[in-house]
Structures are given as C-alpha cells and as structure tokens.
C-alpha cells in the first residue's frame, strides 16, 4: 500500500520550517521585489501629493484662489512657486514630518472641520500660526530655497525693505516675520506681531 502524501498546507509548512537553499533564495528574491515595489509606491505617493493639483483638490474654495492672485503665482518673469515649494520641506526627514501633519489636515477637511470657506476662515488664524511657527523654527528654509539675502541688491529695493533685509542677520529675524500673507489672505491679526519695527 502506498504512503498517503500530506496535504498541501502540511507540505508547505514542512518546506517553510526546513528551508532549503532554494527556499531561502526565493524568500530573499520575493523580499527584494516587495521592497522595491514598496519604495516605488511610496515615492509615487509622495510625488502625487506634492503637486499643486493635489493641494487644490481640497483648497479650491479657500487658499488656492488667493494663491492664484499672489506674487508667487503671477510674476513678471514667469518663475513662480507652487504650494509644495513653500509648504513641503525638501529634506527627507522634515518632509515626512510635514506629510504626517498634512494627513491630519486632510482628515480635518474630510471630517468637516474646515470643509467650507466659512469654517476655513474660522480656523484661518490657528492654521496660519501653525505654519508661521514651522517657518520661524526652520529659519524660513523654504523661502531661502529661492531667496538669498546675501545676493540681494539693496539699491534696487525700497528703502524700508532694504533696511529690513540688512537687519535680518543682526536681529535674528527671518522671512516669515515680515512676509506673512505673501501668498494667502491674512487672518484677523489682532494681537499678532507683524514683524520688524522700522527705526529710521
């Protein structure tokens, strides 16, 4: 009488418990393929969520129209900055931290906290202060990806702007201290520090 073969699950378990060279090789290859696919998918997701179109999908009624009338969108040279240029850091660690915070913001939109212009405006100061604090903490790094105070020609600026830019280094100020509202409508600024005090 012939021996009965163990069922397929039992055979797989035995194969898995006593891995041969082929089994180990298969596991390594499948793990490598899985890792590559995960990395590609992860980067694809990062790129898709780093576009102006993605940002506008939630901000079509509030922040996006304001941006379209800003100096960062309409420029005499045609060189502009899109949403991720200002709101998403370039460095990987800082970018991941910002993406986690952005996920909370997307959640707030879809759960109805800021899904209308009225609700958005009610939370505008809170959201703006969070963004200003982030920019202050990183010395307005996203601004400095394009703007370099050391390369500014102060003679071509209005006198007050030239004075302020020259004082930045000595007073420990950064771009966002004076340039709040550069791309979006300002909230009610009662009690909010506006930036440099110009002393002539």
Curated annotation (Swiss-Prot):
Binds 4 heme groups per subunit. InterPro entries: Cytochrome_c-type_ET (IPR051174), Multihaem_cyt_sf (IPR036280), NapC/NirT/NrfH (IPR024717), NapC/NirT_cyt_c_N (IPR005126), NapC/NirT_cytc_sf (IPR038266), NO3Rdtase_cyt_c_NapC/NirT (IPR011885). The chain crosses the membrane at residues 22-42. Residues 43-200 are periplasmic. It is a single-pass membrane protein. Heme 2 binds at residues 83, 86-87, 184. It is found in: Cell inner membrane. Residues 1-21 are cytoplasmic. One of its GO terms (biological process) is denitrification pathway. Heme 3 binds at residues 143, 146-147. Its main location: membrane. Heme 1 binds at residues 55, 58, 60, 105. One of its GO terms (molecular function) is electron transfer activity. Mediates electron flow from quinones to the NapAB complex. PANTHER family: CYTOCHROME C-TYPE PROTEIN, CYTOCHROME C-TYPE PROTEIN NAPC. Belongs to the NapC/NirT/NrfH family. This is Cytochrome c-type protein NapC. It comes from Haemophilus influenzae (strain ATCC 51907 / DSM 11121 / KW20 / Rd). The gene is napC.
